[in-house]
């Protein structure tokens, strides 16, 4: 079966009211052009970021290969002064390096104490945070975090989903974003919130034969573009150039639905986690049966879940 590739729609000059009343309820990805993002799109050069961002220590991912894999952890965590990170990430080859002269760098900013604090560029990088204007296309009390992201050219981030809605603001550089519909999760060979399929452009079909059935939505983000990624939509990111971006995460569900210990915004909602725990206990109970009976009752359970929990309101 040939994979289905679909373009992510692009709209220019969308107002807050248009987004919230007509676009947001559709729960589909959308590229927004022409939004007021402040002076960051003109200011954030390598020199400016290095000078103004200063020598604050940041924890980064360092990979010897372009395709980062969170499941096998084919990268290491290291610490660099922010200005050094910016300079190295902008290079193709390095005189100073941790693994190899062509290693790749990736920053996903953290709170001051990642165990307790969420990332907010205005708090962790106040000298730069004032340059960016957030598109407040949500209620202020829904705001969760603003994550600073810096990537080396060629770096590919694994396919994963987040449990909160977010805007990916591409401040400088260019990214290719590939998204997959949450309803196609069964084709993505998941391990937790991540897909095992690293090479989405040329997957191993002997190992992942169902992957081409997943609908694939694609867009190219350039400086000044903002991508709306609804919660639960899988996304894979390739930095085609050295790039700087900021993610704005906000709560789509009431606050009490989320895990209060989650500072990254990637823990499943409390009710979902509880349901999975109950399922694990049910599977353990089923294992007490002989194979023939276990298979029979497992199929009955699947049919019941499909009947009671699957929605007919989503494509």
UniProtKB/Swiss-Prot annotation:
InterPro entries: Cupin_8, JmjC_dom. Residues 102-267 form the JmjC domain. Binds 1 Fe(2+) ion per subunit. It holds the Pfam family Cupin_8. Its EC number is 1.14.11.42. The keyword Ion transport does not apply. Fe cation binds at residues 160, 162, 235. 2-oxoglutarate binds at residues 106, 166, 175. PROSITE patterns: JMJC. Homodimer. Belongs to the TYW5 family. tRNA hydroxylase that acts as a component of the wybutosine biosynthesis pathway. Wybutosine is a hyper modified guanosine with a tricyclic base found at the 3'-position adjacent to the anticodon of eukaryotic phenylalanine tRNA. Catalyzes the hydroxylation of 7-(a-amino-a-carboxypropyl)wyosine (yW-72) into undermodified hydroxywybutosine (OHyW*). OHyW* being further transformed into hydroxywybutosine (OHyW) by LCMT2/TYW4. OHyW is a derivative of wybutosine found in higher eukaryotes. This is tRNA wybutosine-synthesizing protein 5.
